[in-house]
UniProtKB/Swiss-Prot annotation:
Protein name as annotated: Protein SYM1
GO CC terms of this entry: mitochondrial inner membrane
Disulfide bridge positions per record: none
Keywords: Membrane, Mitochondrion, Mitochondrion inner membrane, Transmembrane, Transmembrane helix
Biological role stated in the UniProt entry: May be involved in cellular response to stress. Required to maintain mitochondrial DNA (mtDNA) integrity and stability.
Compartment annotation: Mitochondrion inner membrane
Signal peptide as annotated in the record: none
Transmembrane segments: 21-39, 55-71, 98-115, 159-175
Amino acid sequence: MNGFVNWYTASVKRSPRLTNGIMTGSLFGIGDVIAQVGFPEKKGQKYDLARTVRAVVYGSLIFSIIGDSWYKFLNQKVIVKPGKHWTNTAARVGCDQLLFAPVGIPMYYGVMSILEGKSLVDAKKKIEDNWWPTLVTNWYVWPAFQLINFSLVPVHHRLFSVNIISIFWNAFLSFKNSISPSDKKVPVNFPPVPE
């Protein structure tokens, strides 16, 4: 493992965008494979390579750039009290969860919908259906991890550490994104009928 970390550190210093793009895209792809193989929407559903490619494209070309820039911004600009490590770390986690997550989640659903060839109306519907439940789930997972990440991990490794945990988060996102509105369970009396 130490050899890999040394290789990654050298690669990210030499070519940060390329290294982060390859790593992030690969791990988004792994998350999608886990979602498709481990949690298929329908029994006997075949593996969809195009879906995995979309996840890799999103991770490589969009999230890697935004995520790396965001973590550097937090480290450089979110300093509540110079020299107060835990205060600054808590402020960074707060910014991450209250500013980035509420925007990043709809960005994911919107971009994935467009990459799937869906209309802007469909993308908007996907966001409306999934934003709040995904954000709440995000708050169960990420604040504790980000507290550790922002306090112990050097800034140039933060995207990588997030990407490792994100394998499972990406599997969750990929699964949520793959559920069509017709797959969702609705009450028998839906839409509600006045009594």
